[in-house]
Amino acid sequence: MELLKEVILESEEDTYKLAEEIAQLLKGSEVICLRGTLGAGKTTFVKALAKALKVKNPSAVRSPTFTLVNEYETDKGKLIHIDLYRVPDFDYSEFIGEGILAVEWEERDKPCDIILEIEILDENKRKVRIYRK
């Protein structure tokens, strides 16, 4: 994986701008892996990505911690949001190619086209490293 960019986010607006940048890179079948501790902003980023991809109701985007998988229609096909926190060995391979996958807590590099590592710097500040195949 190649480091594409490293940014500091200080607001939800910064998160949305980053999500817009990433949305422009997407063709519609990528796997985006989101890494970071609890509360780092993984779900917040997916909400911003949903908005950037023109999901009809981005405020309805919720963490799939208990459902494991949530799907949303976008201008580029489906956004499939998967959370591996409770079930790290969940096999989501059937979803690959069905849309853009945003996978929280994926620690393996193999399935990832893009990796976002989110580090908490303080209550409102995050460092994000973006890697790409």
Curated annotation (Swiss-Prot):
**GO BP terms, alphabetized:** tRNA threonylcarbamoyladenosine modification
Q: Which Gene3D superfamilies match?
A: P-loop containing nucleotide triphosphate hydrolases (3.40.50.300)
What subcellular compartments does it reside in? Cytoplasm
Per the record's keyword annotation, is Magnesium included, yes or no?
yes
Query: What are the GO cellular component annotations?
Result: cytoplasm
The protein's matches in Pfam families, at most eight in alphabetical order, are given as: TsaE
- Write one Gene Ontology MF term: ATP binding
Name the keywords, alphabetized: ATP-binding, Cytoplasm, Magnesium, Metal-binding, Nucleotide-binding, tRNA processing
Keyword Metal-binding appears in the UniProt entry:
yes
Annotated ATP binding lies at 12, 39-44
Indicate which residues the UniProt annotation says bind Mg(2+): 43, 104
Q: What does this protein do?
A: Required for the formation of a threonylcarbamoyl group on adenosine at position 37 (t(6)A37) in tRNAs that read codons beginning with adenine. Is involved in the transfer of the threonylcarbamoyl moiety of threonylcarbamoyl-AMP (TC-AMP) to the N6 group of A37, together with TsaD and TsaB. TsaE seems to play an indirect role in the t(6)A biosynthesis pathway, possibly in regulating the core enzymatic function of TsaD.
Q: Which PANTHER family match?
A: TRNA THREONYLCARBAMOYLADENOSINE BIOSYNTHESIS PROTEIN TSAE
In the record, the note on similarity to other proteins reads:
Belongs to the TsaE family.
Q: What is this protein called?
A: tRNA threonylcarbamoyladenosine biosynthesis protein TsaE
